[in-house]
Curated annotation (Swiss-Prot):
Gene source species: Dendrocalamus giganteus (Giant bamboo)
Lineage: Eukaryota, Viridiplantae, Streptophyta, Embryophyta, Tracheophyta
Gene from which this protein is expressed: rps4
Protein name as annotated: Small ribosomal subunit protein uS4c
Compartment list: Plastid, Chloroplast
Subunit field text: Part of the 30S ribosomal subunit. Contacts protein S5. The interaction surface between S4 and S5 is involved in control of translational fidelity.
Pfam families reported in the protein's UniProt record: Ribosomal_S4 (PF00163), S4 (PF01479)
Amino acid sequence: MSRYRGPRFKKIRRLGALPGLTRKTPKSGSNLKKKFHSGKKEQYRIRLQEKQKLRFHYGLTERQLLRYVHIAGKAKRSTGQVLLQLLEMRLDNILFRLGMASTIPEARQLVNHRHILVNRRIVDIPSFRCKPRDIITTKDNQRSKCLVQNSIASSDPGKLPKHLTIDTLQYKGLVKKILDRKWVGLKINELLVVEY
């Protein structure tokens, strides 16, 4: 299955706020939920919604998510926490969390168009797995800096997670350590995703 390119707001109304997909948020008393979601929720439906929430937030295909679940299952620690750490340490997500891009699809495009350097090397793979002490910068040209500058200016510096630091003047970010569960930017029960 290919990446989802359809209307984003429909997904947000159905699954709740997904900050990685778009900045828009649904109204609290949405009539759509009353129309379609009546009665008792089945266990399968709950698990499917959690999986879809994770998929659409990080912009993954079904196959990519299954691959991450498989890798997390081989780890000796909790599968759900390892899964979230793998997803949060992706380059496109790190750019989004640093504020260098307003959404994950925008961060993905920055990486694909070769505007981003990791440890002074161009990386054009959005799923590149960052490690602690990785330095993420923009290219030296004016166009790259302008794209990132607009996003940094509109981002909230108070939302920066503890495992990341950013120097807004040099357009440089640093991954200090691996992410803790409490700093994940999405309200999700990762165990339901693993069980699905």
